[in-house]
């Protein structure tokens, strides 16, 4: 049954002109920050790249620069993971992972220990590791089924895991291994720790372009039924995932993003950011240079200017 949403008319908004203006105005930030170097495979990425793509619910696409260049989406993939888990487990998923902002670093152990192994939300590392464990239980062929879901979202069957990145993360992912062991200690993981970690790292290693991400996240704008490769969500569930993105999607900088941009979204240490304007558009931006909180400097500024110049946010 088709969800009854009115599709907003974006014909009177010159998004391409706005994107070009934004690109000119963020140039002073082009040499600030650096790419993630604690993941060796990501440290090799040319930091002087930038792409942006905006896809509207009425079928228009606006992009510039490196919008077709694929990169490691890292934590952006956690939105896909929790969507799949919510489809498969329903509201029971929230017994295993919370919906609250963490207020701490995305790889913090302290809060997890204090709260007996129940992660604050599905977008910090501990929460995403729990979700990966659940998907290992619920999917018949976890790796194949999950990537099929992502491919269905973006409409491109060539999207895939990057095994070099996943292996690199596992080799040096000591803190994530500590998180997984703490989760296991508290009885929050059912599967073998190594199996969970490798699946988690593979999920994070998925490579997509801004163009593919903006198309994939149109599914979360609520303009049509959410049904992709056997993963189905109703309109209420999609809205609630947007709410969690709004409050928890940017590590311990979620409040700043809400204040400056005013859209639900998710970032990743690969330099990507995706944001959603429900019923209107989704937008993906990529620039590998990060701020100390792990978010793309040029990406954050670009999205701040986007909602400023369009005068469109959810508030």
What are these language model-derived features?
Residues 58-59, 72-94, 216, 283:
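Active-site SXXK
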């Amino acid at each position: 049954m088709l969800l009854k949403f009115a599709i907003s008319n974006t014909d009177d908004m010159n998004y391409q002109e706005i994107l070009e203006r934004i690109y000119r105005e963020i140039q002073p930030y082009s040499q600030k920050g650096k790419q993630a170097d604690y993941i060796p495979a990501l440290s090799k990425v040319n930091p002087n790249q930038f792409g942006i793509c905006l896809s509207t619910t009425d079928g228009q696409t606006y992009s510039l620069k490196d919008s077709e260049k694929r990169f490691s989406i890292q934590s952006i993939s956690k939105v896909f993971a929790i969507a799949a888990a919510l489809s498969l487990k329903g509201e029971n998923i929230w017994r295993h992972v919370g919906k609250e902002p963490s207020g701490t670093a995305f790889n913090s152990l302290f809060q997890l220990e204090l709260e007996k192994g129940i992660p604050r939300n599905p977008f910090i590392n501990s929460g995403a590791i729990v979700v990966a464990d659940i998907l290992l239980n619920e999917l018949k062929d976890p790796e194949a089924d999950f990537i099929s879901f992502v491919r269905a979202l973006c409409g491109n069957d060539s999207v895939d895991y990057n095994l070099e990145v996943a292996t690199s993360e596992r080799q040096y992912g000591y803190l994530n291994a500590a998180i997984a062991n703490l989760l296991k200690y508290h009885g929050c993981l059912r599967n073998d720790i190594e199996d969970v970690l490798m699946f988690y790292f593979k999920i994070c290693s998925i490579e997509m372009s801004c163009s593919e991400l903006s198309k994939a996240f149109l599914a979360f704008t609520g303009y049509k039924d959410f049904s992709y490769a056997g993963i189905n969500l109703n309109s209420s569930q999609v809205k609630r995932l947007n709410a969690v993105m709004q409050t928890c999607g940017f590590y311990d900088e979620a409040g700043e993003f809400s204040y400056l941009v005013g859209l639900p979204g998710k970032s990743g240490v690969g330099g990507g950011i995706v944001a959603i304007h429900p019923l209107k558009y989704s937008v993906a931006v990529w620039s590998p240079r990060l701020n100390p909180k792990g978010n793309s400097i040029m990406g954050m500024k670009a999205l701040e200017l986007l909602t400023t110049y369009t005068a469109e946010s959810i508030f």
